[in-house]
Amino acid sequence: MGYIELKNAAIYYEIYGEKNRETIVLVSGLNTQMTRWELSFCNQLVEEGFCVICFDNRDCGKSTFTTDRSNDIHSFSLNDFLRHPEKHTAPYSLMDMADDIGDLLHSLGIQRAHIVGRSMGGIIAQLFAYKYPALTKTLILLMSSSFNPALPKADDALIRKMTSSTTSFKDNKPTFIKEKIDFMKAIYGNQFSFNEEKECALIIEDECRKSSLIKPFRQIIALVSYKYDPDVLHSLHVPTLVIHGDQDPLFRTEHAVDLRNNIPNCELILKNGMGHAIPEALFPSLIKDISAFITK
């Protein structure tokens, strides 16, 4: 475990397994800490013979981002940015976040890796494979999207639940936790039991470990600023696997089909009953899919 220091960011990472093995890099989603790649999931990948790198994206968890005052999130609100994006400059982009992965691999002396991204992390993974094909052995996209604006959108109420909160953990812990749990239940899928006690513990862990310097709106701005470019997909020539839940309410199955149809050499696996989450009951199946794809 440790940090790599970049010009505007400090990226926290942890490594599981031996570094001389095939390396898997796990890329998290929007304002999602590396803790959501649960330790048992990482350990199962290690048992399959892989070295696993987990990290917090910039502005999340233990990773930080610093900027000059002109781009400071406090100088404008998210609503200001959405109404008048031409008047504001996003503090950073999803491509900047993809560059962080390249810097991390370079810092660790890793020549090539298998890149596994979930949700927004899947978009970051696509951009990484697009910009750094020589560093990318395979690309695996879990519950992700190309962000093609023609694809079905999630329900507005669900988006509001994801991007806003009526309170903070510090000001009202019970209400904050309840809102987070209600959102997770809404995206989880109905084929797998939801462990509310475990989710509560993860929420508390995330709040306790995160840096006081992070500003969640900056990642939201990076995502909404992203402009879909089909050439990114068409230019991906690394072996690619898309794994998606057939009950995903955020990125419906059309998003997975779009990825499969537009990325050359791409395979698709649909998981029955899976929503926009990775239940522990699915770990063995997902590990099997990932391992088989990487090693074939």
Q: What spans do the regions from the language model cover?
A:
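Conserved acidic catalytic loop of the alpha/beta-hydrolase fold
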Residues: 91, 95-113
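Conserved hydrolase catalytic core segment
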Residues: 111-151
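Alpha/beta-hydrolase
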Residues: 154-231, 238, 258
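Conserved alpha/beta-hydrolase "acid-adjacent" motif
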Residues: 249-255
